[in-house]
Amino acid sequence: MSRSRQPPLVTGISPNEGIPWTKVTIRGENLGTGPTDLIGLTICGHNCLLTAEWMSASKIVCRVGQAKNDKGDIIVTTKSGGKGTSTVSFKLLKPEKIGILDQSAVWVDEMNYYDMRTDRNKGIPPLSLRPANPLGIEIEKCKLPQKNLEVLFHGMSADFTSENFSAAWYLIENHSTTSFEQLKMAVTNLKRQANKKSEGSLAYVKGGLSTFFEAQDALSAIHQKLEADGTEKVEGSMTQKLENVLNRASNTADTLFQEVLGRKDKADSTRNALNVLQRFKFLFNLPLNIKRNIQKGDYDVVINDYEKAKSLFGKTEVQVFKKYYAEVEAGIEDLRELLLKKLLETPSTLHDQKRYIRYLSDLHAPGDPAWQCIGAQHKWTLKLMQDCKEGHMKSLKGHPGPHSPMLDLDNDVRPSVLGHLSQTASLKRGSSFQSGRDDTWRYKTPHRVAFVEKLTKLVLSQLPNFWKLWISYVNGSLFSETAEKSGQSERSKNVRQRQNDFKKMIQEVMHSLVKLIRGALLPLSLREGDGRQYGGWEVQAELSGQWLAHVIQTIRLTYESLTALEIPNDMLQIIQDLILDLRIRCIMVTLQHTAEEIKRLAEKEDWVVDNEGLTSLPCQFEQSIVHSLQSLKGVVDCKPGEASVFQQPKTQEEVCQLCINIMQVFIYCLEQLSTKPDADIDTTHLSVDVSSPDLFGSIHEDFSLTSEQRLLIVLSNCCYLERHTFLNIAEHFEKHNFQGIEKITQVSMASLKELDQRLFENYIELKADPIVGSLEPGIYAGYFDWKDCLPPAGVRNYLKEALVNIIAVHAEVFTISKELVPRVLARVVEAVSEELSRLMQCVSSFSRNGALQARLEICALRDTVAIYLTSESRSSFKQALEALPQLASGADKKSLEELLNKFKSSMHLQLTCFQAASPAVMKT
């Protein structure tokens, strides 16, 4: 047997020495978890468990027993830790012997305590009693260890009445500190006592000497007289003479007392006749007495009288006796019928059932009343279960709302499962996103849940007594000893024949219990023929996952209670199958309800953005799933004997699909939020990162979210979901032993990425298209012609406007989420560079000034957004530059450089946002 605790260790005992029955306190570690855990305690090899009092895991109080060893360890043994060890020992001292005349606070067993050869005082004068202090001086007990004295005087004793008396040991033990002068006085006292004793004994003998002589003379005279009479030959020997005398005396006595002896014989015969009449009186009065005792319920008296009458008159041939005995048998037959009727009455306690069966057994009732009782109890249990269902259905029709069930069973054989309601894992659903409807579910029990509670309570109130009745029937304890001996072989045969019948009874009760619960909670799992008998509930709404988890806990407790009765597991397997189906159903319902809750999360989006550009929506989504999984922990975890809910591939697939559906529902919520009309958005509590620089002024409280800002917020949430939330949820699924996690993650990630890309493209389209569309009109504003233009004086306004628009996009994105800036600006720059490249390639020819102007503007744009360039945008800029003629002279190059520096200097403040460090990898 495996133990969960360390072995006991005794580290101290107080006191550490003493005589037997000394009260000691034992201290140590791991001395047991309670009084029932302590199963052994020995001190010096003696078992002291009977006197042990467990105080705590580190303290035990007990009394030392009559140990054989003088010194030994203190060994504590517990169920949880086994046999322990000791670092200390106890020394057992020999108790001082209490003298015959000494006062004592306890009773002394003198038969075992004193040596009767030396301590007896019957028939001898008081002077012969040995004094407690023979030396006559004060006794001072020695403090030397007893063990040392025993080693020093091996085989000797300090008891002066012992044959091995040692005077030296006696003096050391009682007079170790006595002075020499006192010892001299002690010798004088000892001599004086010896002389007094001798004188007293001699005087006693002298006083009774004359009595001894008189007795001797009388005995001698009797002996001589007998010898003289025996030698005479008068009428034979002395014995013959004595015989004749005795015979004459006898004859004379007969003559004298003949009349008296006659009267004695007559009195004896009269007495015998009266005794016989008294014996018959018992039989004559017995029928009336039987009726009276039956009315009073004194069945034991009736049975005893019947057994007595049966033994006296059962085989009589006297007609009068036969008549009265027949009346007795008729009364007993009525009693048998009455007892059988009471036995089969329901409800009845197990005690009464056993009592009636024993009475019927003593009365040798025909048939097998015990088996009849078992059958009646079985039918009664089935009827109660069906009545329970019908009663709740009537109550449901009369009161369709939830109610508090009235469990009217008096004897509850298990703790009420309502106490476990607050302990089921599902009840931790107190998050902020739950509505008030969940706050009252504890106090309103649905009818079907109340029915299951009452049904299981009913079964547990009936089945234990039913099972115990069968066990008593099997082992014969229902019957009296006489009935057991007379019908043992027949009953053994009946038990063997009825084992299968009883097994069918138990299975019928289990099947009825399971089908009634299935009819209430899982009606679709019933067969077509069982629907009317066990189903028929008017289901208005599906039970929530919390209530299903509570029902599972109720049935689990029922299963544990039935297992404790030692009912075979094969009879209870059907309950395990029910628990498995309910666990699967609970998981399905909980996940479906979770999907519905998550669908409503869109209504709770407050658009409050934290420093990372996130709203509370991803956190609420994760909390919702975590709470659902926590509520399912007790359901998913397997109790002893239970199978995993994911053992069937079909169940795995369904649960996996429900989990995927939950993730996709949330993704759909995000999509809804991104396309929600502006009028439906509440932005009164819009918040941004206070540390984010706002290039265009502060965002006020009455600022209204635009569709672009909503897209950015949703995109920011999508990024967080992909990097954190979905991975965390996958870990939670794995922690709770869910299957198909990889598939759930892959499908969810794919859907999320698809939404993210679609929303991103929408945002880029909203922001990049206006900028791209403004390039061509800006380039050719004022009838600008690349072939005929003035020398460049700087970057034209159209490019500055494009940069300002890009800066505005940067500011908008940066305000929501810093991490989205590289991704968004890279795509905007790609679109602008691609359009610029197209426009340059569409120009047929450039003048010298036109080529310089175009190169200036292309380089200015490229250098400004250099940190957001991608391979596509670099390629576009390269193609645009390749479409231009090469600079003709060094003067043009110098002019280009001067103009670029002038542009960067003049727009230094505006271009600062493009100088921040960007992540190395930009997602597009």
Swiss-Prot record:
One GO process term, biological-process aspect: protein transport
Single GO MF annotation: small GTPase binding
Modification Phosphoserine occurs at: S431, S432, S435
Annotated coiled-coil segments of the chain: 240-260
Modified residues (Phosphothreonine): T440
GO CC, one annotated term: plasma membrane
Matches recorded under SUPFAM superfamilies: E set domains
All residue ranges annotated as the IPT/TIG domain in the record: 8-93
The keyword Acetylation is assigned to this record: yes
Similarity field: Belongs to the SEC5 family.
Domain notes: Interacts with RALA through the TIG domain.
Subunit organization: The exocyst complex is composed of EXOC1, EXOC2, EXOC3, EXOC4, EXOC5, EXOC6, EXOC7 and EXOC8. Interacts with EXOC3L1. Interacts with GNEFR/DELGEF; this interaction occurs only in the presence of magnesium or manganese and is stimulated by dCTP or GTP. Interacts with RALA and RALB. Interacts with ARL13B; regulates ARL13B localization to the cilium membrane.
Protein name: Exocyst complex component 2
The species this protein was found in: Mus musculus (Mouse)
